[in-house]
Amino acid sequence: MREKQSTIVNCGSLARTLWALDEARLRGQPATGAGVREALDWVTSRFGGEGAYRGLLCAPTTEDLRARLAVPTGEDASLGRGGAAHILGEEAVRALSLWRREEGWEREQVVRSIRDEFRTLAGRPGHFCCLRCSVARWRALTAARPDGWEDILRDGLQLLGERTIDKSGRWRGYPFYYTLLALSETPLAEVDKERRRVRAAAERVLERQQEADIVGRFRRRALEWATAR
């Protein structure tokens, strides 16, 4: 019997492929499965390609650059070509790290680069060029875990804690669902303080959060973590 054709890789969009890979991982699909393996091969083939951030990370597709990029939880991330390339590049590092994919890309060089760049840009190791890009890099570092990643994340959490909470109960400036999703994956005790700060806001939207599409499923996952006691 022929194996079912992959529904994970989308050669027109790195973003869609990465989000589908994450859902496959959460469903427990094996890395050795044909669909997952094909998608991982395609992602690794794009490292250092045309349009890659700093010529090093995973290159977005033409569709990714033309469309309004959204992170997996749906918040707008259309920050121009450089911003899209950066966020998707970080998300690709995260995906390959979580799938424990070593071959096909210069893992040590790439991970060392994102760690060291985080340490030197903007004067704070936990902040990158903007808040959305910062969260993307937190996710990549949490998955890849290079030396010193905990210190970088702790600084990021400190910066998050310095943000005031708006009238809706959310952090000012940070993408709410995307940040929650990042914190839910961060194995540091400091995340609990931030979870408590926004728990009431998460509880208000959880009961009406639908799971009709991939964005809804990622949002619900983040909200369920935020409201857990």
Report each predicted region and the residues it spans.
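Preference for long, amphipathic alpha-helical scaffolds in soluble/luminal domains
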Residues: 1-229
